[in-house]
């Protein structure tokens, strides 16, 4: 694609690939979890169970679209849409390859952080509008967790911004031509990855929807495609965090021999596999442990990383 390609062509193609990738991620995750846990994963619908995602989609689409009579109807319907829209908007600034991307913003990092922080409204509104105690508790947990870890995520990115000298994600990729930022920003990478898992509400940080405490958390009362939108938002979210890690710390599309698009997709897929492995390997912490870890460990580490990066940049300058 060149610079004259209409933006809507880029938009449609990226959305199609993103939804297909997120859908396949569901199948890949379940197959890998089955492999690592020494059991069968999906293996009945289609070869190797690959059509299980189609069966799940049909099941969700044919379920009754039920709204509890005690719920706040308008907000209840709006909440699932917010999580999907904000995640997709955050993905708009991710540069997939030269000439491939929805929009090239000079404030791409800030736009990503802004859209990511708006996702908490979906969870809080969904829990509140359900007018039920378990969704409300899940929404309150999500508000504290996501707002807290948004701080650490932003601080982790500032080291990368200081090294690249720009908030533009394409400039950040170009700045890694000689050295990927995963080496000088190893502390930033670690804190951003942990904060990203917490922001995406994935195991082991899925406290807002922990089944053994809150039934299903903030989406307990949801069914049909409203539940499906939360599900899609979660998988698109983990794809977004993986793509941002690749862009910020692993050189984006940069690499030898293979085309830039192939490098970007390969790196993103490897990061996603690492996140799935974390889900299989780590237990869920208590909620107080999660918050304590954030403010007593993550915050000091990000501040130390910021100070060290600033000192290096000033000394070189």
Curated annotation (Swiss-Prot):
Catalytic activity annotation: a quinone + NADH + 5 H(+)(in) = a quinol + NAD(+) + 4 H(+)(out)
Cellular compartments per GO CC: plasma membrane
Protein's membrane topology: Multi-pass membrane protein
BP GO terms, sorted: aerobic respiration
Main subcellular location: membrane
Tagged with keyword NAD: yes
Pfam families: NADHdh
The keyword Cell inner membrane belongs to this UniProt entry's keyword annotation: yes
GO molecular function, one term: quinone binding
Protein keywords: Cell inner membrane, Cell membrane, Membrane, NAD, Quinone, Translocase, Transmembrane, Transmembrane helix, Ubiquinone
Cellular localisation: Cell inner membrane
EC number: 7.1.1.-
Subunit structure: NDH-1 is composed of 14 different subunits. Subunits NuoA, H, J, K, L, M, N constitute the membrane sector of the complex.
Reported function: NDH-1 shuttles electrons from NADH, via FMN and iron-sulfur (Fe-S) centers, to quinones in the respiratory chain. The immediate electron acceptor for the enzyme in this species is believed to be ubiquinone. Couples the redox reaction to proton translocation (for every two electrons transferred, four hydrogen ions are translocated across the cytoplasmic membrane), and thus conserves the redox energy in a proton gradient. This subunit may bind ubiquinone.
Record-stated family: Belongs to the complex I subunit 1 family.
Protein name: NADH-quinone oxidoreductase subunit H 1
Organism this protein belongs to: Nitrosospira multiformis (strain ATCC 25196 / NCIMB 11849 / C 71)
Encoding gene, per UniProt annotation: nuoH1
């Amino acid at each position: 694609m060149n610079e004259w390609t209409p933006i809507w062509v880029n938009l449609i193609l990226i959305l199609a690939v993103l939804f297909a990738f997120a859908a396949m991620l569901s199948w890949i995750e379940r197959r890998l979890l089955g492999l690592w846990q020494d059991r069968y994963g999906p293996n009945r619908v289609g070869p190797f169970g690959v059509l299980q995602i189609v069966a799940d989609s049909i099941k969700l689409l044919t379920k009754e679209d039920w709204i509890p009579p005690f719920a706040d109807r308008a907000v209840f319907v709006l909440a699932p849409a917010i999580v999907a829209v904000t995640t997709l908007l955050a993905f708009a600034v991710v540069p997939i390859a030269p000439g491939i991307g929805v929009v090239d913003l000079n404030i791409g990092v800030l736009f990503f952080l802004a859209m990511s922080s708006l996702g908490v409204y979906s969870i809080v509104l969904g829990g509140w509008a359900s007018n039920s105690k378990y969704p409300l508790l899940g929404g309150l947990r999500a508000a504290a967790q996501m707002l807290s870890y948004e701080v650490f995520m932003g601080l982790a990115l500032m080291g990368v911004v200081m090294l690249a000298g720009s908030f533009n994600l394409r400039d950040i990729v170009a700045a890694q031509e000689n050295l990927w930022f995963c080496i000088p920003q190893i502390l930033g990478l670690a804190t951003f990855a942990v904060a990203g898992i917490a922001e995406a509400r994935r195991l082991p940080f899925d406290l807002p929807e922990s089944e053994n405490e809150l039934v299903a958390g903030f989406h307990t009362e949801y069914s049909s495609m409203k539940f499906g939108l939360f599900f899609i938002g979660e998988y698109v979210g983990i794809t977004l965090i993986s793509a941002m890690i690749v862009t910020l710390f692993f050189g984006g599309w940069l690499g030898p021999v293979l085309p830039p698009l192939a490098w970007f997709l390969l790196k993103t897929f490897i990061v996603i596999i690492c996140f799935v492995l974390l889900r299989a390997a780590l237990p869920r912490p208590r909620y107080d442990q999660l918050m304590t870890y954030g403010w007593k460990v993550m915050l000091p580490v990000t501040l130390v990383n910021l100070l060290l990066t600033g000192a290096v940049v000033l000394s070189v300058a």
